Amino acid sequence: MEPYAAAEGGGGGGGGGSTDTGLEESMWRMGLGGGGGGGGEAVAAGRLPERPGEADCVYYLRTGACGYGENCRYNHPRDRAAAAVLNGGGKTTHSAEYPERPGQPVCEYYMKNGTCKFGSNCKYDHPREGSVQAVMLNSSGYPLRSGEKDCTYYVKTGHCKFGSTCKFHHPEIGGVSETPNMYPPVQPQPISSSHPYQHLAGWQMGRPPVLPGSFLSGSYPPMMLPSTVVPMQGWNPYISPVNQVASAGGHQTVQAGPFYGLSHQGPSAAVTYGSQYAPLSSSTMPSSSSKQEPAFPARPGQPECQYYLKTGSCKFGSACKYHHPQYLNTPKSNCMLSPLGLPLRPGSQPCAYYTQHGFCKFGPTCKFDHPMGTLSYSPSASSITDLPIAPYPLNYAVAPVAPPSSSSDLRPEYLLTKEFSANQSASPGTTCGPAGAMLKAYAPHMLIRPQTSGAGGMVTTHGGEL
């Protein structure tokens, strides 16, 4: 290294010797060339073109070399250090001077933002007269350009990755719009002084029918819903109406309305069967007079509209190109609702969904028939004792309870199985007391239906009066 250092210190002569060996160019590119003579830079400057009217080659100012060589169209000054200081050190392309090309179109990006991401490599004109107009920014710091299109990214997300240099319009994001009124305004109603809760006098009682009223004391108000906000009557056919009845003991009780054909009749507490089918109310089903059904075209030669077959309607209306069978256009106003709340249409096609699952997701709006062929009880019965309710296990047949009578001959007889001896006397726990006591003493499988007389190795045991 000492001979090379001496040669470098020799000035121009050393530079010429190193050029012959080929080491001068390599050392000059690495920025190690120096000395008083500066022969390395003089040689490099002589090889690269000097164009005083053009912008300085940024790559040359950074590295001291240019890959384009003599074909580079930019200026390569001999004093590279001084040119780098004038151009801001030559660290970024944005700090370089933008070229002026009078014969070329004006750079739109430069005219809007005052900068150009292509720098000196841009092929458009960048006038120096400061023709860049000041751009107004919105509250978020993004430019407002009324004549341009809205920035789609900003409209969707509220942000823009280009910031103030974006060439699109960024409108002000307005405040949150007021929520539209989903419910009608509540009108003040007169308050009755006899109501236990005067501020809730205009509201309607609402309590699940499965919750007995005896669990809630009269001093606690039940859940109430204003009738103007949530209509309780008839808004959903699957929910039975609720009737508020005040008991004499001070407790508020709730009695369930018609459910599966049950209804309250008369002042008695017994629940009897009502009518078999409930008529369809106008609140749950629009009538033909108030709303006329759209006419769907019948095209026998075309495939059937699957959406129409499933829902009974077609969103395309008369413009639909598929076939709409006319037998599905049954009037809705003349149908009846079954105890399940589903329409009965004897002349229509049975609902396939109801046939498979036992219920219909379309409810009373379904246009198909929902037959009630699976109900085994008689809706014309007049007493709740005739309900098909088994107080004991269903696989055990127990004799029905006989009416009370003073005669001992009318008492029911229970037969014991062969497991008990004929000479064994019945214990008091089995012959006296109600049927529940007998069931506690003997298992249900040991009891069979009563007979008038014993037969075939079986012993008759007389029960007590029930």
Swiss-Prot record:
Q: Which parts of this protein are zinc fingers (C3H1-type)?
A: 51-79, 101-129, 145-173, 299-327, 345-373
Compartments where located: Nucleus
Which GO CC terms are listed, alphabetically? Answer: nucleus
The annotated regions of Gly residues compositional bias extend over 8-19
Q: Domain of life of the organism in this record? A: Eukaryota
Q: Which UniProt keywords apply?
A: DNA-binding, Metal-binding, Nucleus, Repeat, Zinc, Zinc-finger
Segments spanning the bilayer are none
Annotated Pfam families: zf-CCCH (PF00642)
Query: What residue spans carry the region label Disordered?
Result: 1-26
A single GO molecular function, which one? zinc ion binding
Decide whether keyword Nucleus is in the record: yes
Recorded protein name is Zinc finger CCCH domain-containing protein 5
What's the source species for this entry?
Oryza sativa subsp. japonica (Rice)
Lineage, please? Eukaryota, Viridiplantae, Streptophyta, Embryophyta, Tracheophyta
